[in-house]
Amino acid sequence: MAPFVTDWTRRFGGPCIAVVRPGSVDEIAQILRACASAGVPVLPQGGNTGLVGGSVPAASGGQPPVIISMLRLTEIGEVDELSGQVTVGAGATLGELQRHAVRAGWRYGVDLAARDSATIGGTVATNAGGIHVIAHGMTRAQVVGIEAVLADGSVITHLSGMLKDNTGYDLAALLCGSEGTLGVITAVRVRLHRPLGRTTVSLIGVGSYSEALELMSRAGVASDSNAPGSRLLAAEVIDEPSMDLVCAVADLSWPLEQRWPVVVLLEVVDGGDGSGLPLDESVDAVVAFDSADQLRLWAYRERQAEAYGAAGVVHKLDVSVPLPKLAACADELVALLATLPEAETFGIFGHLADGNMHVEIVGPEADDLRADLAVLECVARYGGSISAEHGVGRAKAADLHLCRSAAEIAAMRAIKRALDPQGLMNPGVLFD
């Protein structure tokens, strides 16, 4: 039972009554009806790759839940060539959906490092983002239909995928990002995209976050002027401490001629000739044209979570700020963390293109939240969000007020009460 009750960070976890692994929507409905009748909490769980405690029970307080594992609901339907859509079981992994789409001549718009363990249901429940948000948007932008079981065991099925359907509330959009607090997502209908063409990937050293943003802006201009029809697909950022850590843990060498405070990863759809990159002789960069070399460059970014996990218990702060304020906020966060003795190791990496920073802190005990709160309060001062793509979970439930007004929180609580009047769906997540 251990894999179901402790999350990836090793910071969150607690007891449960049982772990059940239903194989159908009907079985899930029966479980929810039984739990509702007995007043027992329910915790839906996908691949348990969450980083904010939303996919595991609380350590203490309240009645232990029944964990509903979705890992048997793995069916992926045939790709509808006419609409460019497919219906996917909640337990299928992101990687399985990606490969299924590619075999049919399509691609799915969401991608992230945990693709082979994160489930589709989990990515929908958290409205996952990943590396291609600038091109395709968050998970919510991919979802065109949903099937879910509500707290009382009733089943809602809306999987037609019609793009024009204004008959009432958009329940798919509501359940996307709800973190298991409104119901159990069992299947989704998602839109697919045609392949974009050959890409070029580059790691580029810059002196600051301001320079990183300027470089990203120039990449967009270069794509438009040098390679008509091309586009910026991804823009990632990795600071020097994070680069050093991943090099040490993953046995990678520093990829550039010089050391830089910030390294930017750009992926551009440009026919694979590098014409979409803003490069000249003054830039310290390494460029990859074939897929093997591109995967090697992506490893510096995608193995960051592994690197910080090897360093100890990680406090992971997934935040976002408006792009015009990102550089100032990042600089202030680095200066702030340098003053905190408990923050023995820290760094920033993330999705530059959409203002999403992953602030990683190793050193504080699992329940020592002083550094966490300092980071979240700093982000709030810049008008940012305390959760960019990982969800609120248990980790940030008490901090929701930092970026949501009292009126907004009251409205969300009202929705929660309407769909889950007994408060049995993932209690303690999203709201404290």
Locations of the language-model features?
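C-terminal substrate-recognition/cap domain of FAD-linked oxidoreductases
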Residues: 190-193, 200-206, 213-374, 378, ...
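Feature of Fe-S/electron-transfer and energy-metabolism proteins
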Residues: 2-4, 20-21, 26, 34-37, ...
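Activity-critical C-terminal alpha-helical subdomain
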Residues: 154, 397-432
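Conserved, mostly hydrophobic/aromatic
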Residues: 35, 180, 420
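N-terminal flexible segment immediately upstream of the FAD-binding catalytic core
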Residues: 1-33, 50-84, 113, 242-253, ...
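FAD-binding subdomain of flavoenzyme oxidoreductases
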Residues: 75-82, 86-231, 236, 424-426
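N-terminal accessory segments
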Residues: 1-8, 15, 38-40, 281-294, ...
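Residue-level signal for inorganic ion chemistry
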Residues: 35, 48, 91, 153, ...
